[in-house]
């Protein structure tokens, strides 16, 4: 779920997930479309697919 995904981002990246990644790239945040712009955005894309 989104809560667990946020906890994982905090642990791995050491940053609060929503201020830093809430509107990042094409897939981090609400919705998503297009091609992921980098590995971080790809991780959000994969999360959206599950």
From Swiss-Prot:
It catalyses: a 1,2-diacyl-sn-glycero-3-phosphocholine + H2O = a 1-acyl-sn-glycero-3-phosphocholine + a fatty acid + H(+). Keywords: Antibiotic, Antimicrobial, Blood coagulation cascade inhibiting toxin, Calcium, Disulfide bond, Hemostasis impairing toxin, Hydrolase, Lipid degradation, Lipid metabolism, Metal-binding, Myotoxin, Neurotoxin, Secreted, Toxin. Expressed by the venom gland. Its main location: secreted. Binds 1 Ca(2+) ion. Contains 7 disulfide bonds. It comes from the Eukaryota. P-bromophenacyl bromide (BPB) completely inhibit the catalytic activity whereas it only partially reduces the toxic activities. EDTA and magnesium ions partially inhibit the catalytic activity and partially reduce the toxic activities. The active site is at residue 47. GO terms for cellular component: extracellular region. It holds the Pfam family Phospholip_A2_1. Its cofactor is Ca(2+). One of its GO terms (biological process) is arachidonate secretion. InterPro entries: PLipase_A2, PLipase_A2_dom, PLipase_A2_dom_sf, PLipase_A2_His_AS. Disulfide bonds join 28-44. Transmembrane segments: none annotated. SUPFAM superfamilies: Phospholipase A2, PLA2. Its EC number is 3.1.1.4. Dimer. Snake venom phospholipase A2 (PLA2). In vitro, shows anticoagulant activity and induces cytotoxicity when tested on C2C12 myoblasts/myotubes. In vivo, when tested on mice, induces myotoxicity (intramuscular injection), edema (injection in the subplantar region) and lethality. Also induces neurotoxic effect on mouse neuromuscular preparations and has bactericidal activity on the Gram-negative bacteria E.coli (ATCC29648) and the Gram-positive S.aureus (ATCC 25923). The catalytic and anticoagulant activities of BnpTX-I are higher than those of BnpTX-II. This is Basic phospholipase A2 BnpTX-1. It comes from Bothrops pauloensis.
């Amino acid at each position: 779920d989104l809560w667990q995904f946020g906890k994982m981002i905090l642990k791995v990246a050491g940053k609060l997930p929503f201020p830093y990644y809430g509107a990042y790239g094409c897939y981090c945040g609400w919705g998503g479309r297009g091609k992921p712009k980098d590995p971080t955005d790809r991780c959000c894309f994969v999360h959206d697919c599950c």
